Design a protein with these regions (language model features):
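Active-site loop of short-chain dehydrogenase/reductase
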Residues: 2-3, 84-85, 130-143, 178-181
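Conserved glycine-rich cofactor-binding loop
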Residues: 11-12
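The beta1-alpha1 cofactor-binding region of Rossmann-like NAD(H)/NADP(H)-dependent oxidoreductases
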Residues: 61-73, 105
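Substrate-binding pocket helix/loop in short-chain dehydrogenase/reductase
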Residues: 99-100, 107-109
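A short, exposed helix-loop element centered on a Lys and neighboring polar residues
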Residues: 123-124
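Catalytic loop of short-chain dehydrogenase/reductase
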Residues: 139-163, 169, 173-176, 188-202
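C-terminal beta-strand-loop-alpha-helix "lid" module of Rossmann-like NAD(P)-dependent dehydrogenases
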Residues: 181-231
C-alpha cells in the first residue's frame, strides 16, 4: 500500500538514502531538509533529478527541525498536498567528537536540540493527523551506541541518542491505542557511506581539548576512529539502513518489529536491547497494560 512519508534530515546520509529507497518502493516521500534554497540547493537539485529520472514520487521539503514554525509549516504542506500523512521517520541528527569536558553546556544543549527536541517538534505537528486517521507509523533512527559498546570522545552524541531512544520507547506505549505503530531502527557505526563522522562537531573549548589531546590521551582520537573503521566489515553498506526502513514500512499493520538492528560491527547493542525490551514488556504485563505492546487497529 502506498504511504505518504516524511523523513527529517534527508539532505545526506541515511536520510537521503532512505528517501530514495522509499520512493523506489512506490511511496510518496517528502525529504525534509533545511535551507533548500541555500546551503542545500544542490541536494535539492540532485533529488529532483533523481525523482524525474526514476519516475518516483519524491519531493524536497523545507523543514528545519530546530524551528517550530518551520516544522509546522512543513507538516501542514504535506497534509494540504496529500490530505494525509502515514509515516514519520525521525532521522535528523548530528554528531560531535572530542573530549566530553571540552564541550560547553551550550554545545550539549544544541546536540540535544537536533537529536531529541527535533523529534518532539515533529511529533507535536504531525501526530494529531495520524491520531485522526487512527493509523500510522513512527520510525526512529536510533544508534547502537545507546546500549552497545561506547568508544570514547562521542559523549554528546551518545547522550543525545540515548535520550532519543528513551523517548521513542515511551511514545510507543502512548501511541499504541491510537493505532500508531513504533519501529526503532538501530544502526551501528558506519564510517563509510555517510558524512556522519566527516561533518561531526568539535569542542568549543580548544584549550581544554588540547590538555587531553596533548596529555595522557594523546593519539586516542585517531586510535578510536581507526579501531571503529577496522571493526566495520569491508562489505558494510549504509544502504542497509535504508533497506531496513523500507522493509519496516512495507510490512502489514501489526507485523512491524519494535526494534531492528543494522550493525555490521556487532557492538553488543542487540543483546542488551533484547533484555531491556523484554523487561519493558514484562513490566507492562505485570501492571495490566499489556495491550500497549501492540497497536490497536482503529481503521
Amino acid at each position: 500500500m502506498k504511504q505518504v512519508i516524511v523523513i527529517t534530515g534527508a539532505s545526506s546520509g541515511f536520510g537521503a538514502l532512505s528517501a530514495r529507497a522509499l520512493a523506489r518502493a512506490g511511496h510518496t516521500v517528502y525529504a525534509g531538509m533545511r535551507e533548500t534554497a541555500g546551503r542545500n540547493a544542490s541536494q535539492v537539485a540532485e533529488l529532483e533529478y533523481y525523482a524525474a529520472e526514476h519516475h518516483v514520487d519524491l519531493h524536497a521539503l523545507e523543514l528545519d527541525v530546530v524551528s517550530t514554525p518551520s516544522v509546522e509549516a512543513a507538516i501542514a504542506k504535506i497534509i494540504a498536498d496529500c490530505d494525509r500523512l502515514d509515516v514519520i521517520v525521525h532521522n535528523a541528527g548530528h554528531m560531535a567528537f572530542g573530549p566530553a569536558e571540552a564541550f560547553t553546556p551550550e554545545q550539549f544543549a544544541q546536540l540535544y536540540d537536533v537529536n531529541v527536541l527535533s523529534a518532539q517538534r515533529v511529533n507535536r505537528a504531525a501526530l494529531p493527523q495520524l491520531r485522526k486517521q487512527g493509523r500510522g507509523l513512527v520510525v526512529w533512527v536510533s544508534s547502537s551506541s545507546t546500549r552497545g559498546g561506547t568508544p570514547p570522545y562521542l559523549s554528546p552524541y551518545f547522550a543525545a541518542k540515548a535520550a532519543m531512544d528513551s523517548l521513542a520507547v515511551s511514545y510507543a506505549g502512548e501511541l499504541a491505542r491510537w493505532g500508531i505503530e513504533t519501529s526503532i531502527i538501530v544502526p551501528g557505526a558506519f564510517t563509510k557511506g555517510t558524512n556522519h563522522f566527516a561533518h561531526s562537531g568539535s569542542p568549543a573549548d580548544k584549550t581544554r581539548a588540547a590538555e587531553y589531546n596533548e596529555g595522557p590521551y594523546a593519539g586516542l582520537a585517531e586510535q578510536a576512529l581507526k579501531g571503529l573503521a577496522a571493526l566495520e566489515p569491508p562489505d558494510a553498506d549504509a544502504n542497509a539502513v535504508a533497506e531496513a526502513i523500507v522493509s519496516v514500512v512495507d510490512k502489514p499493520f501489526g507485523k512491524r518489529p519494535f526494534r531492528l538492528h543494522v550493525d555490521p560491527s556487532q557492538d553488543g547493542a542487540e543483546i542488551v536491547n533484547g533484555v531491556a525490551d523484554r523487561v519493558r514488556a514484562e513490566l507492562l504485563r505485570r501492571i495490566g497494560l499489556e495491550d500497549l505492546l501492540r497497536p490497536y487497529a482503529r481503521s
